């Protein structure tokens, strides 16, 4: 039995438990879950939001101009211009917010943490941030030694009815409608792969296996699985956009539609109004066919007979129509300003002048800072969940990407140099110049120069070296091939 959640009738973790271990019943449950998920409001919002993110507008694309005949019957307007111009503002806003928070990567207190999370951790975090802002939620799967990210449109979450925790989920994908449907059921005690080919029932592709597999290889037996284990909790963590997990487009979609519709109407008016029409004089006895023939002759021969002296012959005078522009332009400018306010986006044109002070620039970032502060809390909660699964005790921090007055910021750092150590000053100056990723290489070169000075001058005082020890890591395992 389905239960209501946030306006959608979705299946829950308790529904999965009620199915039991019968594979036929579990496959029916998976098929039903996917169908209900694709028909849910959250899925439809995510699908539309992805189109807005890509620079399309599904609302105006579905809109058709209608005209009515003398009997009052509606017909599709096939005559007037119907340009449909979509803006990319939503995509710009999402990319700006993600880049602002995660553009410089995630920093940890222990340098070894990044290595244990995998080389692509920062890239996966950027992907997760985009998915979460677009659809309202994304899902991160810790797969032994690296992070994998699922979007809402490919993952059915199964929440616990009692505490709201994510306890199971179904990832599904299908290249085309006539291609096989693949699905993976993730549970606390392992995962199972399924496949549903065209015209066939769903079958088990791979039996349930634990998430961490221990492998051994020998010449006689080759590679074999000799042991397996699971994580202390469900290995998929949701990244929500706020407590309600709402798309960033929620509440602002109508304004985006208004801007796109207004822009489209202006182009349509120009298309329709940028015409030359003819005023025919002394043609009262001519019908529509005569008018067309007369104008065709004027266009081809460029001659119009006006009659003899005192005789009022037929004449043709060309005129033009100018489309209204100023009023529409003012409306478009107003809607753009409203979008920046509603989305709390940073408008770089406000600080485009080269003489902006650091205080003025910082003030321009206030709306974006307020919005990103909320999203940062969600990102931090997500990362802490991943760290717990990986068995890492650490905390993340972030360096936000800002437009700054470099000379003023540099002077501020150097004025306080007596109160900071070399490491802090070096990191700050590199960050200001956009070279924060060069810190490790710079420190290696400085250490090499230090050693060279010591070798050339034996009396030069050497710095004490402290031995750093690291905890031993667990034995090798095999990641899930999801």
Predicted regions and their residues:
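Extended, helix-rich architectural segments
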Residues: 1-147, 471-482
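Short glycine/proline-rich turn/loop motifs
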Residues: 93, 101-105, 313-322, 448-449
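Short secondary-structure junctions and interdomain/linker hinges
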Residues: 37, 41, 124, 132-139, ...
